[in-house]
Amino acid sequence: MGAELYRIGAQEEAELDTSRLLVLRQSLGDERCREVVEEVVFHLTDRLGQLQTALDGDNAADAQVLAERLASLSEQVGLADFARVARDLAACLAAGDATPTSAVAARLMRLGEDSLFSVMVYADQSAL
């Protein structure tokens, strides 16, 4: 009598607010817009790594600051869902509740990869 294990593929698709990118493109031009998006994606990637390190080290104060920075950076390039989840994580960290913090942090990490990929693909394709 063995237990059956089911693997649940938890994947979330990123939603991209293309109007933010269009405003950037109109104000900066194609080339500079792409550079800005690449720079923001680099910073988001870096901060996601720092956030994971802070969470693994039980450093809630640093993790909260990083989550808030992730939220504001991601909004600049149209990643509203990612920003909302990052703000949710900051709120969980501020409340000091470990269970929702773990769940929301895992969701942010899942959403992060697809979000960053989506914004880069859109920025490259729309420049054509």
Feature map (PLM): residue ranges:
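Two-component system phosphorelay core
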Residues: M1-V65, R69-Q76, A80-L128
